[in-house]
């Protein structure tokens, strides 16, 4: 994920796929995208080719459209302050902060049916 990210801006998009190898092959052949591997369950693409940094994570078959929805990821300079602001206006943390290669992130619900994530170094 980009180190020069703007605070609270959309910075990353994450999709779910049941077939990492097939997804990689499709986007490499269709759009000439290159990928970075993060193990057998995650591949990432970059904004130089795709217009935004993002990735595909391995997941099970989607049961509904909301299960298949991409995950929009915002950047924060201060995860704790951002969590506090979300909770203060009625949002909820649905996935607690966890480490991933490149930083930490959490997922939140805005109370209107949308789930987004926030990350930081």
What are these regions (language model features)?
Residues 1-24, 51-52, 70-72:
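N-terminal beta-strand motif that seeds the catalytic metal site of vicinal oxygen chelate
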Residues 3-6, 28, 49, 65, ...:
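Generic structural signal for beta-strand residues in well-ordered domains
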Residues 23-27, 86, 113:
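Conserved active-site tyrosine of GNAT-family acetyltransferases
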Residues 9-45:
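N-terminal first-folded block
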Residues 33-67, 115-120:
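Conserved short beta-strand elements that form part of the metal-binding/catalytic scaffold
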Residues 1-6, 10-18, 36, 62-121:
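Vicinal oxygen chelate
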